């Protein structure tokens, strides 16, 4: 330990505009709230806190659009869409972007079959019509590869899914589905990403010893809740949460090398909290995915800009505003320039 010398601590003198703070925030960075678009399959279910379609699960705006005709059974099968099915899927994507979606996620893990199709169509449509980008992640499985960097040598990531058999089937069929989509598009999609051999961006092999696929088939109440309709559905989510947490803990005891959990099943995402408490391990899920994508549009740009101020003058307190939930849009005259002339020049391509 080095020598510690006590020095008087002086708080910086910062002046805040408490009268018209939001007007000043607008001048700095804009406060249009980030919007997440949820692409839905043609399937109705009761949403609950923690579900990707429940607005209480996020602190930003959520909109949704349904790919009509793409039922759960069809999504699970991953069969090729006919011309009508493809148009209905693309129409749902257009609705999301036209209504302000900054990025798009799916409400069903099986939508991973259309990751490439939706991603490339969304990017193309958003760019041509609005001159912007629209990131797409249809499944939390896209987090599997980067999460491997977080676990120790010999460790595993437990991938939690509703049905182990169904998820194993996805691995076998996904490359075929993607290849068919590429052929339909004249091979354009394979050239739109750096790794043409894996254009989905989901580089995962469930036979990799670093992954442990765990199905919730044995959790009876959860399976019943998935299968049930209307009044027959299981409503006591606390009981289901306890069952899932206990099941994961038992799996963990048999597989102590599991260092983290990744929830693939969208409807199981609402129980991530129970797994965290029950197992003591970090858990990532579809909600994590939405929050991760939202951070590409929010928080630090307004906060840092407001804290620094223009040329260091009179910074605002970001915690006293909602700027952290907004994105720097450049839609209002002069707002980019308020961050400094160089930022306006960057946007105009003159710097």
Swiss-Prot record:
MF terms (GO), sorted A to Z: dimethylpropiothetin dethiomethylase activity
Catalyses which reaction(s): S,S-dimethyl-beta-propiothetin = acrylate + dimethyl sulfide + H(+)
EC number assigned by the record: 4.4.1.3
The keyword Lyase belongs to this UniProt entry's keyword annotation: yes
Domain of life: Eukaryota
Assigned keywords, A-Z: Lyase
Residues annotated as catalytic: 108 (proton donor/acceptor), 265 (proton donor/acceptor)
The family this protein is said to belong to: Belongs to the aspartate/glutamate racemases family. ALMA1 subfamily.
Miscellaneous comment: At least 10 million metric tons of volatile dimethyl sulfide (DMS) are released into the atmosphere annually by the dimethylsulfoniopropionate lyase in oceans. It is a component of the tangy aroma of the seaside and functions as a chemical attractant that guides various marine animals, such as sea birds, invertebrates, and some mammals, toward potential food supplies. DMS oxidation products act as condensation nuclei, causing water molecules to coalesce, with possible effects on local climate through enhanced cloud formation.
Task performed by this protein: Mediates cleavage of dimethylsulfoniopropionate (DMSP) into dimethyl sulfide (DMS) and acrylate. DMS is the principal form by which sulfur is transported from oceans to the atmosphere and is a key component of the ocean sulfur cycle.
Self-association state and partner proteins as the record states: Homotetramer.
Name the UniProt record assigns to this protein: Dimethylsulfoniopropionate lyase 1
Species assigned in the record: Emiliania huxleyi (strain CCMP1516)
Higher taxonomy: Eukaryota, Haptista, Haptophyta, Prymnesiophyceae, Isochrysidales
């Amino acid at each position: 330990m080095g020598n510690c010398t006590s020095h008087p601590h002086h708080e910086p003198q910062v002046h805040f505009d408490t009268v018209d703070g939001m007007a000043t925030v607008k001048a700095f960075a804009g406060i249009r709230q980030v919007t997440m678009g949820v692409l839905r399959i043609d399937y109705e279910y009761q949403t609950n806190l923690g579900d990707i379609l429940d607005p209480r699960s996020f602190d930003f705006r959520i909109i949704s659009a349904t790919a009509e005709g793409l039922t759960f059974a069809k999504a699970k099968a991953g069969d090729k869409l006919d011309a009508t099915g493809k148009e209905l899927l693309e129409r749902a994507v257009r609705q999301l972007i036209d209504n302000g979606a900054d990025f798009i996620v799916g409400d069903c893990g099986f939508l991973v079959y259309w990751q490439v199709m939706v991603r490339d169509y969304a990017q193309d449509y958003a760019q041509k019509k609005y001159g912007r980008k629209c990131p797409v992640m249809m499944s939390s499985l896209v987090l599997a590869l980067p999460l491997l960097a977080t676990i120790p040598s010999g460790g595993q990531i437990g991938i939690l899914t509703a049905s182990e058999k169904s998820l194993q089937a996805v691995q076998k069929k996904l490359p075929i589905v993607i290849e068919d989509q590429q052929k339909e598009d004249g091979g354009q999609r394979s050239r739109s990403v750096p790794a043409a051999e894996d254009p989905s961006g989901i580089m995962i092999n469930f036979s990799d010893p670093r992954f442990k696929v765990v199905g919730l088939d044995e959790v009876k109440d959860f399976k019943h809740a998935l299968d049930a309709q209307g009044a027959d559905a299981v409503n006591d989510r606390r009981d289901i949460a306890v069952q899932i947490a206990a099941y994961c803990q038992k799996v963990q005891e048999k597989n102590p090398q599991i260092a983290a959990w990744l929830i693939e099943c969208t409807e199981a995402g609402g129980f991530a909290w129970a797994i965290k408490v029950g197992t003591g391990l970090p858990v990532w899920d579809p909600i994590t995915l939405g929050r991760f994508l939202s951070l590409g549009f929010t928080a630090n740009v307004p906060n840092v800009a407001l804290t620094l101020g223009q040329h260091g003058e009179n910074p605002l307190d970001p915690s006293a505003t909602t700027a952290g939930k907004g994105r720097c849009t450049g839609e209002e005259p002069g707002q980019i320039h308020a961050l400094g002339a160089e930022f306006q020049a960057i946007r105009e391509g003159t710097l």
